[in-house]
Each structure stands twice: as structure tokens, then as C-alpha cells.
């Protein structure tokens, strides 16, 4: 097969420590890559690379199914999900499966079904991966030309991109269908403390949906992370799904324009770097979403956000001291500001104390107590419901930092419980993964650009000191 560059330029120079270790058709001499370079050995073997990817998908789906069943087996319905270290069941609950009013789990069978379906799927994927890795054709170009490709074939690459975009669009519409027709999804804002409901009044106005993208990412605005109702979330998925599907059709039917042909590097490693860059952005956005957003990630399942736990503490002590006779509207704190309530610089009534920094929190247990100018004093005196008190006391002691007030407290704080919030885990893991994927993006982009520019990449190991040393054994 013709390649874009000489083999010397296309592959880095890497020398095996043990030159006798070889796999037929997959050794360093025939591929230019040592065994530990993994899928790089399969750059020009589309059939074997397909096997590697399908097997990888099988591993991912197997983990999802096994972890799902593990969480079901350990689940205690009497305790909130976020106290049990669960990271998969909260996602299923958010989709409206197995939960009732207030986020209470009423049926774990759907979770069991989900785990089993993933395990069965992983077996199918695993079989396909092993088949294509060991038995199927090494290259697909001859026997299955539709599935074959050459990395530098720009038209074929954009066709593959288009197929991927259509699949992503279909995925977005699956969520829309679930929310509209198949039982609905969990809405933390439903009256009385959250419930599963069908979304009937989708937001499809482009000014609203795309308005989020034009917001500042900082406090009070919060870019797309500030979305606080399911109508906008599901409507956004209608827009996203439509854009992905029409974009996919566009990329299948067209060839890259001249400016795109000039601007991009067209090689396997370049596509890898583009993908890693995109995944990095996804990771950082997911981190912000799960840390700050309590609509897409309801606090009933993931635990409170940091600001939510802090505001819950202020609310809990306001309720307590008001019952003991304190006048919460006028009591002064040690700094001369309001002890329980104060005014923000723009005039709204907000909670006083160190939680003032979180004045822009919106949470379903707190919003009913607001009026046109922030917190409503008469509602705070007469309208507080028992479920709001219970929920705020629970959130106060379950801050995502493992501290009482999520600001300066520590895990040993007297009223806190020793637990790790899934919100912390999901935010931190996605930040770390986003960072490493970004480093991988830079690494592979640099190598791809170097190869395209025609100079050597990788380390020349012909004169490496280790080669002149005695073998370890």
C-alpha cells in the first residue's frame, strides 16, 4: 500500500531491548514499532485496528456492567446514594429509572437490568474484538472497501467523521425521547422536593439555547453550566442532536474545502491528536458541570454542590435560632454585618456570614423562600416547610469537600460525616483526565506536525547507552 511518507519518516526509531521477541506481522521489523507501542503497530492494518477498538469498547462496557451490578449489590435504599460512594446509579436515577418523589429509590430492578444488558453487550463486543484481532482480515480495503480507509484519503476521513457525528446526534435524541415519551426524567425542581416527570414544554428558541454560549463563564452568569431547568437541557439536546446529524450528512456528502486541506495535517496520529483535544474539552466542561450544576446532576443523588452545602448551613442555623427567638432580620454578626441575613452589593437580601460569597446559588429547597428582592423575610418567618429543613440539614453535613461548610471546614468538623462525595470524585476525575488528554493532544499533535514537515520524530536509539550494557539476566 502506498504511504504518504517514507517508512523511516512515518515511524519513530525505537529499538527493542530484546530483539528476539516478535509476533508474526506485528514485530518491530515489519511495523517500525515495538510491542509496547500498542496500536501504533496497526496503523496500516485497518482490520487489526478495528479489532483493537472493538475489544476496547468491550472492556469499557464490561466495566460499566460489572460496576453497575456491584453498586446494585451494595445499595442500601434507606441511605442517600451520595453516602454510598455510587457513581453509576446516580446517572440511572437522574434518567428517571427506579426513583419516585424526593429522589427516593422505589425499585432497583431497572438498575439490575442495566447492568446485565451491559454485560451481555460486552460479551458481543469482546467476541467481535477477538475475531477481528486474530481471525478477520488484516486489512479491510480489499474485502470490505466500504469499511477500508487510507489515512491520507481526506474524503474518506470526513465521511468517517460524518458517520460518527450522526451516531452522536442519535445519542442526543435518545435522551430527548426518554424525557418526552418514555417515562420522563428526574426533575429536582418539581414541587415538593423533586420527582420524575415527562418534559412537555421544550425550549427550542435559538436565542435562549445559544444565549448560554454567549454568557460569561464567571459567577452570576456561568456560561452553559448555569442551565437550571430541564426544558432548556432537553431542548438543547434537540438542537445538538440536529446539528450533529445535519453536520454528519454534510461531511458524508462533501469533500474538504481547500482551506481545510491546507490547514490540517492528514495522518492517523493527527486525527488522534484532534480527538484527544476534543475529549480534553469535554472533560473540563463535565468537571464544571458536575461541580456546580444541581439540575443536570441532582443533589438528591450526587450530594450537594459546595455553594449549596454552605448556604444550607446558614439556612439551618437561621431556622434553629429563629425558633429560639432571634430576630433574624436585624441580628448583627461579629463583623457588624448581618448575622443571618444581609444585602448584596446590588440590593438583594442574601444569607450573611462567610456563605455570602455563594449568594448566587439556586437550589430547589431554597427558591420557594425568595421574593422579588432576594430572600423574603416574611416567607422565612412563616413559610419554611419541614422538607426544606431536613434537606438543608442533610446537605450541610455532606459538603462535597467532606467538610461542614465547604469553605474552611475539615473532614473532622464536629457535625460532618466522614464520606467522599460522588460530586467531588466525578469533578476531580474529569479534571485530571481532561488535563492528561490535553497533554496527549499536545504530544501527538507535535509528532504529527513533525512527520508532516518531514523531520524525524521519536528517539534515535542506535547509540543508546543501554544497548552496550550486559542484559539484566
UniProtKB/Swiss-Prot annotation:
Database matches in Gene3D superfamilies: photosystem ii from thermosynechococcus elongatus
Binding-site residues, [CaMn4O5] cluster: 367
Bilayer-spanning residue ranges: 69-93, 134-155, 178-200, 255-275, 291-312, 447-471
Residue(s) carrying Phosphothreonine: 15
Predominant subcellular localization, coarse grouping: plastid
Sequence positions bearing N-acetylthreonine: 15
Gene Ontology annotations for the cellular component aspect, listed alphabetically: chloroplast thylakoid membrane; photosystem II
Record's subcellular location: Plastid, Chloroplast thylakoid membrane
Keywords: Acetylation, Chlorophyll, Chloroplast, Chromophore, Manganese, Membrane, Metal-binding, Phosphoprotein, Photosynthesis, Photosystem II, Plastid, Thylakoid, Transmembrane, Transmembrane helix
Membrane-protein topology: Multi-pass membrane protein
Propeptide: 1-14
Single GO biological process annotation from the record: photosynthetic electron transport in photosystem II
Cofactor note: Binds multiple chlorophylls and provides some of the ligands for the Ca-4Mn-5O cluster of the oxygen-evolving complex. It may also provide a ligand for a Cl- that is required for oxygen evolution. PSII binds additional chlorophylls, carotenoids and specific lipids.
UniProt-listed Pfam families: PSII
Task performed by this protein: One of the components of the core complex of photosystem II (PSII). It binds chlorophyll and helps catalyze the primary light-induced photochemical processes of PSII. PSII is a light-driven water:plastoquinone oxidoreductase, using light energy to abstract electrons from H(2)O, generating O(2) and a proton gradient subsequently used for ATP formation.
Family statement drawn from the similarity comment of this UniProt entry: Belongs to the PsbB/PsbC family. PsbC subfamily.
Protein name per its UniProtKB record: Photosystem II CP43 reaction center protein
Naturally occurring in which organism (per UniProt): Cycas taitungensis
Gene name of this polypeptide: psbC
Amino acid at each position: 500500500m502506498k504511504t504518504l511518507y517514507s517508512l523511516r519518516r512515518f515511524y519513530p526509531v525505537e529499538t527493542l531491548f530484546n530483539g528476539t521477541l516478535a509476533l508474526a506481522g506485528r514485530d518491530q521489523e515489519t511495523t517500525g514499532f515495538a510491542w509496547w507501542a500498542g496500536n501504533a503497530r496497526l496503523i496500516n492494518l485497518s482490520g487489526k485496528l478495528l479489532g483493537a477498538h472493538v475489544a476496547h469498547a468491550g472492556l469499557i462496557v464490561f466495566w460499566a456492567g460489572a460496576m453497575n451490578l456491584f453498586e446494585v449489590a451494595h445499595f442500601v435504599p434507606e441511605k442517600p446514594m451520595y453516602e454510598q460512594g455510587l457513581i453509576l446509579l446516580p446517572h440511572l436515577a437522574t434518567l428517571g429509572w427506579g426513583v419516585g418523589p424526593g429522589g427516593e429509590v422505589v425499585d432497583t430492578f431497572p438498575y439490575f437490568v442495566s447492568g446485565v444488558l451491559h454485560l451481555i453487550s460486552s460479551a458481543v463486543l469482546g467476541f467481535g474484538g477477538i475475531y477481528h484481532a486474530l481471525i478477520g482480515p488484516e486489512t479491510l480495503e480489499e474485502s470490505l472497501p466500504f469499511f477500508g480507509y487510507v489515512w491520507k484519503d481526506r474524503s474518506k476521513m470526513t465521511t468517517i467523521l460524518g458517520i460518527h457525528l450522526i451516531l452522536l446526534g442519535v445519542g442526543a435524541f435518545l435522551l430527548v425521547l426518554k424525557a418526552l415519551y418514555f417515562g420522563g426524567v428526574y426533575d429536582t425542581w418539581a414541587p415538593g422536593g423533586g420527582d420524575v416527570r415527562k418534559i412537555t414544554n421544550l425550549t427550542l428558541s435559538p436565542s435562549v439555547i445559544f444565549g448560554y454560549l454567549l454568557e460569561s463563564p464567571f459567577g452570576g452568569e456561568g456560561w452553559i453550566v448555569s442551565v437550571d431547568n430541564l426544558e432548556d437541557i432537553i431542548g438543547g439536546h434537540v438542537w445538538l442532536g440536529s446539528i450533529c446529524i445535519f453536520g454528519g450528512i454534510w461531511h458524508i456528502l462533501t469533500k474538504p474545502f481547500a482551506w481545510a486541506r491546507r490547514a490540517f495535517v492528514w495522518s492517523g496520529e493527527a486525527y488522534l491528536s484532534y480527538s484527544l483535544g476534543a475529549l480534553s474539552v469535554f472533560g473540563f466542561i463535565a468537571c464544571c458541570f458536575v461541580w456546580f450544576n444541581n439540575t443536570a446532576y441532582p443533589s438528591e443523588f450526587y450530594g450537594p454542590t459546595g455553594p449549596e452545602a454552605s448556604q444550607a448551613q446558614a439556612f439551618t442555623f437561621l431556622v434553629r435560632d429563629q425558633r429560639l427567638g432571634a430576630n433574624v432580620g436585624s441580628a448583627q454578626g461579629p463583623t457588624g454585618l448581618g448575622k443571618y441575613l444581609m444585602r448584596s452589593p446590588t440590593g438583594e437580601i442574601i444569607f450573611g456570614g462567610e456563605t455570602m460569597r455563594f449568594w448566587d446559588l439556586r437550589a430547589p429547597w431554597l427558591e420557594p423562600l425568595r421574593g422579588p428582592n432576594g430572600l423574603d423575610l416574611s416567607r422565612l418567618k412563616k413559610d419554611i416547610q419541614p422538607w426544606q429543613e431536613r434537606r438543608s440539614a442533610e446537605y450541610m453535613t455532606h459538603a462535597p469537600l467532606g467538610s461542614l461548610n465547604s469553605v474552611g471546614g475539615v473532614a473532622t468538623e464536629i457535625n460532618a460525616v466522614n464520606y467522599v462525595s460522588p460530586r467531588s470524585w466525578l469533578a476531580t476525575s474529569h479534571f485530571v483526565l481532561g488535563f492528561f488528554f490535553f497533554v496527549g493532544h499536545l504530544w501527538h499533535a507535535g509528532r504529527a506536525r513533525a512527520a508532516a514537515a518531514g523531520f524525524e520524530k521519536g528517539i534515535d536509539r542506535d547509540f543508546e547507552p543501554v544497548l552496550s550494557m550486559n542484559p539484566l539476566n
